[in-house]
């Protein structure tokens, strides 16, 4: 049962606004104490009303919580952001690069809202107040034991189907990077941190992760 329906059933005599406020409070409390209900279909309004600081993604009505990243995860993400931003700036490019919190409405609608570790958008018409609406050009995920299955499975499929041009999966544990260039249909390429990794979206950019982490 939808949480709003549940609260309204319990408070039939309340004013509509008061009942809606009670429903929102109940929703936040349930999420904080119990986590998302696997049997419930969550809406974009539910997603936007998540308690402040609670990071999650929305895929076809299902909420997926995101764990707090490790220190190394943050270092890699930050250094990638610096490297890409500096490259774009040095070339006078129009592409934009973002790190979380930054929502990607990967299908262009409200059904799938993801939060990649690094997002590069070259078509500025896709950028809005709420994030990116449509497929970014380049996405990077810094994987962890808790996210690896989704990064290599669900997200890989969603990014490819949406039209993302390039997708990197960085594994800090074994210091490797998997690169997918969906735009050309090439097979995945595998790199170690101490190798110079070429970027498809920016052909004159190469990144050696061992230089920064």
Name what the model sees in each region.
Residues 1-213:
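Gly/Pro/Ser/Thr-rich low-complexity, intrinsically disordered segments predominantly at protein N-termini
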């Amino acid at each position: 049962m939808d949480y709003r329906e549940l609260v309204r059933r319990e408070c039939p005599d309340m004013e509509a606004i008061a009942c809606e406020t009670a429903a929102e409070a109940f929703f936040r409390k349930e999420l904080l104490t119990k986590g998302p209900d696997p049997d419930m279909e969550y809406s974009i309004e539910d997603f936007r009303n998540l308690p402040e600081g609670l990071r999650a993604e929305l895929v076809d009505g299902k909420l997926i919580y995101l764990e707090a990243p490790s220190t190394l995860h943050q270092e890699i993400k930050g250094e990638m952001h610096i490297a890409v931003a500096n490259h774009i700036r040095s070339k006078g490019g129009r592409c934009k690069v973002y790190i979380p919190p930054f929502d990607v409405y990967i299908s262009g609608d409200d059904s799938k809202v993801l939060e990649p570790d690094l997002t590069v958008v070259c078509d500025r018409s896709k950028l809005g107040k709420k994030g990116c609406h449509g497929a970014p050009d380049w996405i990077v995920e810094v994987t962890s034991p808790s996210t690896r299955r989704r990064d290599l499975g669900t997200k890989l499929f969603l990014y490819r189907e949406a039209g993302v041009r390039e997708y990197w999966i960085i594994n800090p544990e074994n210091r490797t990077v998997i690169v997918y260039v969906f735009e050309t249909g090439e097979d995945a390429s595998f790199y170690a941190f101490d190798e110079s990794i070429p970027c498809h979206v920016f052909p004159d950019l190469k990144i050696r992760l061992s230089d920064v982490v």
